[in-house]
Amino acid sequence: MSWRSEHIWIELIAGSRKISNFCWAIILFLGSLGFLLIGISSYLDRNLISLFPSQQILFFPQGIVMSFYGLAGLFISSYLWCTISWNVGSGYDRFDRKEGIVCIFRWGFPGKNRRILLRLFMKDIQSIRIEVKEGFYARRVLYMEIRGQGAIPLTRTDENLTPREIEQKAAELAYFLRVPIEVF
């Protein structure tokens, strides 16, 4: 989503609160909980899950391994739920032609550097760069080339934009910033 006026362009960036992350977190939580319950039921020799009789699983070595996988999956699932709740990666890109400043803001993990803010002068922007990698895992990424600082990505690597969409976005941004476009 973006908002534009004559002098300001604000591009909102979606973070980790995506449907795919929710689905993976739920699937991982339920699967690892199932593994852990089967491992515990093999240790207790009771059926904690009625669909699967615990007598078929010996605690050593299958029950221990399933318990370990269940715990590992719960840790990974809790990590996913934390990134979703903190909305890591979300933020905005603000281009202000009137003041000549570009602000790139992202939310990070809690701690000292939770808020990530880059402030740049528009005069330091060399170009808008499109990087295209075709093949099995094709990706198209939009970068802003800065003098002395390298390239700053403006789109996510998992954002699957069509060639037409990325070209249009690059052309509009380059026109707004009055800089050239480079394609790699």
From Swiss-Prot:
Protein localization: Plastid, Chloroplast thylakoid membrane
Keyword entries, A-Z: Chloroplast, Membrane, Photosynthesis, Plastid, Thylakoid, Transmembrane, Transmembrane helix
Main location: plastid
Residue ranges of the TM segments: 22-42, 57-77
A GO BP annotation: photosynthesis
Topological type in the membrane: Multi-pass membrane protein
GO cellular component terms given for this protein: chloroplast thylakoid membrane; photosystem I
Pfam families in the cross-refs: Ycf4
Keyword rRNA-binding: no
Matches recorded under InterPro entries: PSI_Ycf4_assembly
Stated family: Belongs to the Ycf4 family.
Protein role: Seems to be required for the assembly of the photosystem I complex.
Protein name: Photosystem I assembly protein Ycf4
Organism: Populus trichocarpa
Organismal lineage: Eukaryota, Viridiplantae, Streptophyta, Embryophyta, Tracheophyta
Primary gene name: ycf4
